[in-house]
Each structure stands twice: as C-alpha cells, then as structure tokens.
Design a protein with these regions (language model features):
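Active-site core of glycosidic bond-cleaving carbohydrate-active enzymes
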Residues: 1-149, 153-154
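C-terminal beta-strand-rich structural cap/linker in extracellular carbohydrate-active enzymes
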Residues: 158-171
Length: 171
C-alpha cells in the first residue's frame, strides 16, 4: 500500500515485545528505529510507475524513512515508549510536531485523510498516543501544552508514572 519495507517492518503494535525479540532485543529494535530516522529518504516507485505524493512528502519532510506524512509511520516514534524509553519518543514527537506541522494552509506534512493527520498532532502535543488499536491504553510521550482538557476534565499525561496510561484514566 502506501508504506515501504521500512515502515511496514515496524507494523506490529499488538506484539512489540515479539518484534523486539526478532530484532535481537529491545536495544537492537530501538537502534533499528534510530537507523530509520537517520536513513536518507529514498523510495522506489515500483508498480505506481511514477512518484506519488506520499513519496514526495516523505522526502520533503526529511525525517529519514519515517514518513510521518502517512499513516503507516504514525506509531513508529512511539515504539520507543512502548519499550520503556519515553524520552526517545518525546524527542522525535516534539521534533515532528515542531518541524513537520504548522498553522499555514499547507501545515500538514501529508494529506488530512479524514482527520488522521490532525489527530496525530493532537495526540503528540497532549503527550500520549493509542499505540495498539483495540488495546485500552495509551503510550506516553511528553506533553507540549501547558494545560489540556478532555470531556471537561483537565488531563496531564506527564503526571502518570511509567510508559503506559490506561484508557480509563483519561476518558
């Protein structure tokens, strides 16, 4: 689909520990993600026969192979946190929010796709993310706003210990 082998190699949010085992352990998996961010943006047009906008956007954003302009990469910066390294997630999410998004007319790094791009940004600045679909929890990042309210209640992702926030604690 719209992801490459780079992005799809990490598409296992339901078994991140198993993925880490396949890479030889947590540290090796995190090193591979470091490599993903450091790698020059490159791609093959393959069956498309031409460069499509997702390819152009990934190269323009210049976050290596993390094509934050497209859904297959949305969870990638949060893998660090899922493995217990919240600060590494916070670094990349803050950098992406500040450098890839803006309030300009073209302020999203990719197409909006029914709100997914905006919601990724909102989760990023709130400091948590629904890492695994269907699992009632969020992984932590670091909040980038002074105060936030959800359903009339103030929420503060930074006030939770550890790297996981139960869904019930926020909603």
């Amino acid at each position: 689909t719209e992801g490459s082998a780079w992005q799809n190699s990490f598409a296992v949010p339901h078994d991140i520990e198993g993925l880490a085992e396949l890479y030889g352990g947590r540290e090796q998996l995190m090193r591979k993600i470091d490599e993903l961010f450091a790698e020059k943006p490159h791609y093959e047009v393959g069956g498309y026969g031409r460069e499509i906008h997702e390819m152009t956007e990934m190269a323009a954003a210049d976050f290596g192979q993390c094509a934050i302009s497209n859904q297959p990469s949305f969870h990638i910066p949060y893998i660090y946190s899922a493995l217990g390294e919240v600060d590494r997630t916070a670094y990349w999410v803050e950098k992406l929010c500040k450098e890839a998004f803006s309030y300009a007319d073209d302020g999203f790094p990719g197409d909006e796709d029914n709100g997914t791009m905006a919601l990724w940004y909102v989760f990023g600045v709130l400091g948590f993310y629904p890492f695994c679909p269907g699992k009632p929890e969020f992984v932590k990042g670091r909040k980038q706003v002074k105060r936030a309210f959800l359903c009339g209640r103030e929420i503060d992702a930074d006030s939770f210990d550890g790297n996981i926030i139960p869904y019930s604690a926020l909603v």
